[in-house]
Swiss-Prot record:
This is Transcription elongation factor GreA. One of its GO terms (molecular function) is RNA polymerase binding. Belongs to the GreA/GreB family. It comes from the Bacteria. Necessary for efficient RNA polymerase transcription elongation past template-encoded arresting sites. The arresting sites in DNA have the property of trapping a certain fraction of elongating RNA polymerases that pass through, resulting in locked ternary complexes. Cleavage of the nascent transcript by cleavage factors such as GreA or GreB allows the resumption of elongation from the new 3'terminus. GreA releases sequences of 2 to 3 nucleotides. Keywords: Coiled coil, DNA-binding, Transcription, Transcription regulation. It comes from Rickettsia prowazekii (strain Madrid E). HAMAP family: GreA_GreB. Signal peptide: none annotated.
Length: 162
């Protein structure tokens, strides 16, 4: 897959950090674990060896995945963004039309999304409904609980805590 995907500068640094850690710490540690397990004798019935090999396969797979992701990442510094229209990186405050409760979401890349921290993927239904809207606009979003309607109250572009 060669398609670019948006990611915040902080999100990209987090990917790079994980990649570096896997390559320089975990890879070395798993090699040592495999060598130690080999010393325990017959490999055909060596559970430690099999577990270490499985972990090695997982680590190598994750390294490949992270290398692919970092190669395809389109890094967007949201601190340099501004404007009234909602786009990637926006922190958007909404009012629920039914409950009049205020809710805030941050539109991020799919690998940074974490609903517990109010970070929603740009590919999510709520983000898709919000993109291009501005303060005062109303949006409707289909949720598992049915159709929800929101009014956009604020749009900001500010540093994220990941």
């Amino acid at each position: 897959m060669n398609t670019k995907f948006p990611i915040t500068a902080k999100g990209f640094k987090k990917l790079e950090h994980e990649l570096k850690h896997l390559k320089h710490v975990e890879r070395k540690k798993i090699s040592e674990d495999i060598a130690e397990a080999r010393e325990h004798g017959d490999l055909s019935e060596n559970a430690e060896y099999e577990a270490a090999r499985e972990k090695q396969a997982f680590i190598e797979g994750r390294i490949k995945e992270l290398e692919d992701m970092t190669a395809r990442a389109e890094i967007i510094d949201i601190c340099k963004l501004s404007g009234d229209n909602i786009k990637f990186g926006a922190t958007v405050t909404l009012i629920d039309d039914d409950t009049e409760e205020e809710v805030t979401y941050i539109i991020v890349g799919e690998y940074e999304a974490d609903i517990t921290k109010k970070r929603v993927s740009i590919a999510s239904p709520i983000a898709k409904a919000l993109i291009g809207k501005s303060v005062g606009d109303f949006v409707e979003v289909t949720t598992p609980k049915g159709l929800k309607s929101y009014e956009v109250v604020t749009v900001e572009y500010k540093e994220l805590d990941l």
